[in-house]
Amino acid sequence: SLPQTFRGAYVRSQDLDNLTLHAGRLDRMNQRDSTNYQKMTVASPNGRFNGAAQSDNFTFMGGDYQWSEPLTLKYYHAELEGLYRQDFLGFLDNRPLGSGRLKTDVRYHISGEEGSAKAGKVDNRTFGMMTTYIHGPHSLGAGYMQLNGDTAMPYIAGSEPLVGSEGALSSEFLNPKERTWQVRYD
């Protein structure tokens, strides 16, 4: 099946040394099982949020700063108007170690209500990290993720939250106060 698609505008700038800036505004989404564009909603498995609340304005901005050869620092801010806002801080370190590479990916999301809070209460802080040793075509990693706050981490219904459990087919692991560990071989 095809992935979901969004309608809107996106700009990227690499005009400053070591800095990539991103900004965009989306007003509609076409789900995988649909033939038309619709307003966006918050994912609401098990009734976590008001999944019927809609928005036609998702804005985001942020950037990636290449601090040094192995280290990239990241910050992004996003708002789904009237539903939720989210800040993201992260760093990615990818350095040689022995005959391979050690990759460490740390992510921190801070989420709260936005505007009229039509999706309901949003109170979440999600910390996740994954450390992976890569040697040739093989990689072995270990990760941990912890959610704090009174609610799950919000994200746009039909999209994929990138929080540290990519490739896990059983769950998105975003419930309130949830803690997960993973060991992964690719």
Model regions: which residues?
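Transmembrane beta-strands of outer-membrane beta-barrel pores
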Residues: S1, R25-M29, H77-E81, R95, ...
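Outer-membrane beta-barrel strand-turn architecture
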Residues: S13-D17, Y65-E69, E79, R95-S99, ...
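Repeated loop/turn-to-beta-strand initiation elements of outer-membrane beta-barrel proteins
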Residues: N18-H22, N30, E69-K74, G98-T104, ...
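Outer-membrane beta-barrel translocator domains and adjoining extracellular loop/strand segments
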Residues: D33-M40, Q86-G90, G115-D123, A152-G158
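C-terminal structural cap/anchor segments
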Residues: G149-D186
